[in-house]
From Swiss-Prot:
Its EC number is 2.7.7.50. Keywords: GTP-binding, mRNA capping, mRNA processing, Nucleotide-binding, Nucleotidyltransferase, Nucleus, Transferase. It is found in: Nucleus. Belongs to the eukaryotic GTase family. This is mRNA-capping enzyme subunit alpha. GO terms for molecular function: ATP binding; GTP binding; mRNA guanylyltransferase activity. Second step of mRNA capping. Transfer of the GMP moiety of GTP to the 5'-end of RNA via an enzyme-GMP covalent reaction intermediate. It holds the Pfam family mRNA_cap_enzyme. Residues 408-466 are annotated as: Disordered. Residues 413-443 have a biased composition (Polar residues). The gene is CEG1. It comes from Kluyveromyces lactis (strain ATCC 8585 / CBS 2359 / DSM 70799 / NBRC 1267 / NRRL Y-1140 / WM37).
Amino acid sequence: MDNNRVAPEIPGLRQPGQITNDIRMLMCKLLNSAKPANTFPGSQPVSFHLADIEEKLLAQDYYVCEKTDGLRALMLIMVNPVTKEQGCFMIDRENNYYMVNGFRFPCLPRANKKELLETLQDGTLIDGELVMQTNPVTKLKELRYLMFDCLAVNGRSLVQSPTSSRLAHLGKEFFKPYYDLRSYFPDRCSTFPFKISMKHMNFSYDLAKVAKTLDSLPHVSDGLIFTPVQAAYHIGGKDSYLLKWKPEVENTVDFKLIIEPPVVEDKSLPKSDKNRFYYNYDVKPLFHLYVWQGGNDVNNRIQDFEQPFTKSDLELLERTYRKFAEIEIDDKQWNELKAMEEPLNGRIVECSKDQESGAWKLLRFRDDKLNGNHVSVVQKVLESIGDSVSLDDLEQVVDEMRSRWKEREQGLKNAQKQFNHQASARSSLSQQHSTEPEQSQDQPKYVDDDDDNWSDDEPDTKRQKI
């Protein structure tokens, strides 16, 4: 098992049912979403296939960033209307809500930096990944939240805005005041539960540059994420245009692990003695991988190894799961698992498939997930492995990607020029003395028109456009 891939835990208190339901309803209202309140609102990427190069990456503009191998979580920031206190909630993929105390998130100051201590974000929902990474100075592991999207900011839903606009709002209206608070008032931030950064977004044709950084990042990264620039946010479920690319060795599947210790017969005991058959815990057991077929797991107990699933337990389990494969655990790995002194049976495990031997290998436990991958997802992952796209395949179309990006960019500029020319002509007819049309008062001015690309660690003072 790869210890570097151990998923971090959310440093918060899981909220009870009624409070969770109340917050879920408030969030649905915030997003103007018709999705059920019990559905995780985060969008889910799909595995990359060879056809996606022509049909998607070459057909429209995409951002690319590294795929962090951490714990996916949304961050919801709201002010209690009664107490006027700001609350921060982390939402995992099972749609559980955890209150995280200790933060303060201010609004963007309009006059002076003192406003950082006087204002509070209210109604902001961010998408990101919790990850354990190595501090480059202290060399110690620290918890960090890497943000890569924004669904709402200060009560305004952004899900219908394009990705470029959402990132701009995230950078200017959330990350900049947060960063300024840490810069100007570090004593007020010393007890923050974890640090927060924005992920670097690059143009899709810079994918080779991003790929070269994967091994040198302070955290584990297992591929690339491609996000369409002009797309709205897909609330809940799979987004067929949000693509995750992994090297062949990084394509993984989540299963439920079922342990079967060998049964030994003590022939010295009477056949009627219930102790005649017993489990031999001195021998390495069999490790079965079960694939989820849908539905609620009616046997979701996490049991100790000393309490294997009974026949009736397995009958219940097989209403929603079926045996898929066995996993190879060598003696060294088995000793490591025993040394953990943790429950093993019934847990969700992330596994990779060795392409030469075809054997499944254990990577880590996924206690953040209630169920393994659905059988349809497993099938798609296996197809993705068979239809694998290498980094070389992607790099071969980089020039074409850049060329088509520039063509679309020039087309937009030409369309804007034509629009401005027509607007100027109409204005000249109505105002003979006017040589240049004034901007309409009801024409929206978007934040991203003048916004910055905030880096992972500090705002880009050079105001580089995303």
